[in-house]
Amino acid sequence: MSQPAELSREENVYMAKLAEQAERYEEMVEFMEKVAKTVDSEELTVEERNLLSVAYKNVIGARRASWRIISSIEQKEESRGNEDRCTLIKEYRGKIETELSKICDGILKLLDSHLVPSSTAPESKVFYLKMKGDYYRYLAEFKTGAERKDAAENTMVAYKAAQDIALAELPPTHPIRLGLALNFSVFYYEILNSPDRACNLAKQAFDEAISELDTLSEESYKDSTLIMQLLRDNLTLWTSDISEDAAEEIKEAPKGESGDGQ
C-alpha cells in the first residue's frame, strides 16, 4: 500500500480545525506543529497562531487541572497521616508531571526553533514571547528546587522581552498586550509570591487601557474588555487576599488572540 501524501499547509490547518471540533486536542497539536515547522520563510497567520495556541492550551490545561486536583488530595491525605496513600498519590502525580514536562518542552522547542526567530511584526513577537513565558510558568508551577528556579527565571526573561516590545509597539488596549499583563501579574503573584508587584502591574495595565477605551476598534473590543474584566477580578481577589486568605480561582488570559489561559 502506498504511503499517503504529505498534507499541504492548508490541509493541516483544516485538519486542526476538524480535530478542534472533535475535541481531539493532541491531534490538533500535531497538525499545527506541522504548520509551524513550515514558517521559516513566512510567519503563521493570525488564525494559524491562534489554532496552535488553542491546541496546546487545551492539552496542557487538562493536565494542569489534574495536577491541582491530585495535589489537593495529597495534602488532605498528608494531614490525615495516611502515608501509604501518599506514596501512591506521589507516584501518580509524578506521571502527570512527566506529561506536563513533555508538553511544555514540545512547544518551547517549537517557539525557539521556528516561531520566535521567524516573527517580524511586533504583535506576533509579543504573542510568541508571551507564550514562551506561559509555558515556562507552567513548568514552574510543579517543578521544585533548581528546576523551579530555572523555570521561573526563564519565565521572567520571556515576559520581560514581550513587555518591552508591547509597551513600545502596541496600544494599551491591545488584547495581546493586556493578556501579557494579566499572565505576567499572575506569575508575580503565584510563582514569585509578590502580591504587591502583581497588583501594581495589573492595575497599571487596567488604568492605561481604561484611559484609551474610546480608541478601541470594534473587532478587538470584546477581547480587550474581557481581559480588562479578568484583570479587575484578580485585583479584587488579590487585594482582599493581602488582608485575608482568599482561595478563589486566579484568572489568566483566555485562549485565542490574546494568547492563552486556563
UniProtKB/Swiss-Prot annotation:
One GO cellular component, as annotated: nucleus
Pfam families registered for this protein in UniProt: 14-3-3
UniProt keyword annotation of DNA-binding present: no
Keyword presence, Nucleus: yes
Subcellular location: Cytoplasm; Nucleus
Keyword annotations from UniProtKB, A to Z: Cytoplasm, Nucleus
SMART domains, A to Z: 14_3_3
Induction text: By wounding, drought and salt stresses, benzothiadiazole (BTH), ethephon, methyl jasmonate (MeJa), hydrogen peroxide, abscisic acid (ABA) and incompatible and compatible races of rice blast fungus (M.grisea) and rice bacterial blight (X.oryzae).
Chief localisation class: cytoplasm
Source superkingdom: Eukaryota
Annotated tissue distribution: Ubiquitous.
Protein family (similarity comment): Belongs to the 14-3-3 family.
Job description of the protein: Is associated with a DNA binding complex that binds to the G box, a well-characterized cis-acting DNA regulatory element found in plant genes.
PANTHER family the record matches: 14-3-3 PROTEIN (PTHR18860)
Name of the protein in question: 14-3-3-like protein GF14-E
Record organism: Oryza sativa subsp. japonica (Rice)
